[in-house]
Design a protein with these regions (language model features):
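Active-site loop/oxyanion-hole signature of alpha/beta-hydrolase fold enzymes
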Residues: 40, 49-90, 250
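Conserved alpha/beta-hydrolase catalytic His-Asp/Glu region
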Residues: 124-125, 129, 142-197
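Conserved HGGG/HGGXW glycine-rich cap/lid loop of the alpha/beta-hydrolase fold
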Residues: 9-61
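Flexible "cap/lid" loop of the alpha/beta hydrolase fold
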Residues: 97-105, 110-142
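Short alpha-helix in the alpha/beta-hydrolase fold that links the catalytic acid
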Residues: 200, 214-223
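Acidic catalytic loop of the alpha/beta-hydrolase fold
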Residues: 209-213
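Short beta-strand/loop motif that positions the catalytic acidic residue
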Residues: 198, 204-206
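Catalytic active-site module of serine/aspartate enzymes centered on a nucleophile-bearing elbow/loop
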Residues: 228-262
């Protein structure tokens, strides 16, 4: 574990492996430890960089910057600090809010974008309709975050994982429990017009049993992302990388081999 002080945040991160750089951006139920099933898989061919967003793990905002600084700005400064000019970004859920704006605004820095269970901060009528229809699921997840429950159904994984993989369900909740109370909020402000000149190779993946950000929402995001490809994973909830790591790693590996080979 390494801590660095940026202008707006102290960031907890880890670097493993060698080769072209991949940054893994976790979701709201995790932190840099969440990627324990991905880093060993990719570190022989890629430099794997994991970090915790401010207020997650051991990362924190400096001087209450969370109300005025976006996660994408933190990521850009983080990359600059590490002197990484070009990178592949792997975004899980909330991590899409971190990564998609960077791919839109600075395509020369982002070689490839892998969007897992996330529409990022995209807003379209279809995405907004799906988000509204799924508000109950989001509320359940919010309560789980706040209460830090470890022994009950965690919406970020899903009921199937709770039943079929109780040890994984427990581990996920234990990692989640390392996070701090969250004060920052995510903006939803990218429009289809903002995506008109988009040119970053992008794949969206979605679990067909996702109750947090459902497949209809992810499909709608893929539809307005030029050149994007959509993959659906059956019998899987919101956290494909955690529930079905072999499937996740194979999909990501195939994408990287084509767009960002080691």
């Amino acid at each position: 574990m390494t801590l660095i002080n940026l202008s707006s945040a102290t960031i907890d991160y880890e670097i493993e492996g060698q080769g072209p750089a991949i940054v893994f951006a976790h979701g709201a139920g995790g932190n840099r430890l969440s990627w324990w099933q991905q880093v060993p898989y990719f570190m022989d061919s890629y430099t794997c960089i994991t970090f915790s967003h401010p207020e997650f793990g051991r990362s924190s905002w400096i001087d209450d910057a969370g109300g005025r600084v976006e996660y994408s700005e933190v990521l850009l400064e983080f990359l600059d600090h590490l002197e990484i000019e070009r990178v592949a970004l792997v975004a899980q859920s909330m991590g899409g809010w971190t990564c998609l704006p960077l791919a839109v605004q600075m395509p020369d820095r982002v070689a490839a974008l892998f969007m897992a269970s996330t529409p990022g901060n995209l807003s379209t009528p279809e995405i907004d309709q799906a988000r509204e229809a799924n508000r109950e699921g989001l509320e359940r997840l919010r309560r789980a975050w706040e209460e830090r429950r470890t022994g009950s159904f965690n919406p970020a994984l899903g009921e199937r994982c709770s039943t079929d993989q109780p040890a994984m369900h427990y581990l996920y909740s234990a990692i989640q429990g390392l996070n701090q109370p969250r004060t920052s909020r995510l903006r939803i402000d990218l429009t289809p017009e903002d995506m008109s000149g988009y040119r970053t190779p992008t794949v969206y993946i979605t679990g067909e049993e996702d109750v947090v950000l459902p497949s209809s929402m992810i499909a709608a995001a893929a539809n307005v992302t030029p050149g994007a490809h959509l993959e659906r994973v059956p019998e899987t909830g919101h956290s494909i990388y955690f529930e079905r790591p072999d499937v996740f790693n194979n999909l990501l590996s195939g994408f990287l081999q084509h767009e960002y080979p080691a």
